[in-house]
């Protein structure tokens, strides 16, 4: 299992798969499955009519993307993607930073 370095609210870009090129913030991180849910990426699901839902129809469900298909967008230069690294701050706490711009991440 990979270590998930992404957090809710990080601005990411999909770099592979069906939704390649899509950008958006992370809504939810599924650590046990190494997946993230990104705003704006949905799967369309056909729902058959049932007693509870007599209409049925098409429903949009949020889709998750594997973390290997996602890259962080650099907070300083919004057009570049970067990796996440860690650094020990002056107060002794471990802080996430963007590797390219050395900017601190929330």
UniProtKB/Swiss-Prot annotation:
GO BP annotations, alphabetical order: translation
GO molecular function: rRNA binding; structural constituent of ribosome
Cleavable signal peptide: none
Gene Ontology cellular component terms for the protein in this record: ribonucleoprotein complex; ribosome
Keyword annotations: Ribonucleoprotein, Ribosomal protein, RNA-binding, rRNA-binding
Residue ranges of coiled coil: none
The organism's place on the tree of life at top rank: Bacteria
Annotated InterPro entries: KOW, Rib_uL2_dom2, Ribosomal_uL24, Ribosomal_uL24_CS, Ribosomal_uL24_KOW, Translation_prot_SH3-like_sf
PANTHER family: MITOCHONDRIAL RIBOSOMAL PROTEIN L24 (PTHR12903)
HAMAP family reported in the protein's UniProt record: Ribosomal_uL24_B
Subunit structure: Part of the 50S ribosomal subunit.
Function, in words: One of two assembly initiator proteins, it binds directly to the 5'-end of the 23S rRNA, where it nucleates assembly of the 50S subunit. One of the proteins that surrounds the polypeptide exit tunnel on the outside of the subunit.
Family as reported in the entry's similarity comment: Belongs to the universal ribosomal protein uL24 family.
Name the UniProt record assigns to this protein: Large ribosomal subunit protein uL24
Organism from which the protein derives: Spiroplasma kunkelii
